[in-house]
Amino acid sequence: MNHYSFSSLIRAFIPLSLVIVSAAWQPAALADTRHIIVDSGDSTLSKEAARQSKEQWDSTRSLRNKVNNRVEKEFDKTEKAIDGREKCNASYNVNAYWENTTDRCLDRRTGRPVTP
């Protein structure tokens, strides 16, 4: 009876051992088929994308410079008007007055521009 159970146990372990061996063999077989592709990134599509990105950057840079120049010009104009008003109001010339619509210091009698 003991001998019969041992042989049936062996018969059960043989297929089980084959499954274990085949499972252990599988990673080695997969490792042989794997390969690594190293790409330098210089494909035609990536070059075209880089060119388009640079072109867009250059155009937005030009636009930003135009906007910044306009803002700077407006600031300088306002600053010049404020300085002119302060000089005109501090002037010793009694007939000088500041005209807000034209941002100029004018003579009360003649209406001509005065340098304070």
Swiss-Prot record:
Signal peptide: 1-31
Record's keyword terms, sorted: Signal
Superkingdom to which the source organism belongs: Bacteria
InterPro entries xref list: DUF1283
Coiled coil: none
Pfam families noted in UniProt: DUF1283 (PF06932)
Record family assignment: Belongs to the UPF0482 family.
Protein name as catalogued: UPF0482 protein PC1_2049
Species annotation: Pectobacterium carotovorum subsp. carotovorum (strain PC1)
Phylogenetic lineage: Bacteria, Pseudomonadati, Pseudomonadota, Gammaproteobacteria, Enterobacterales
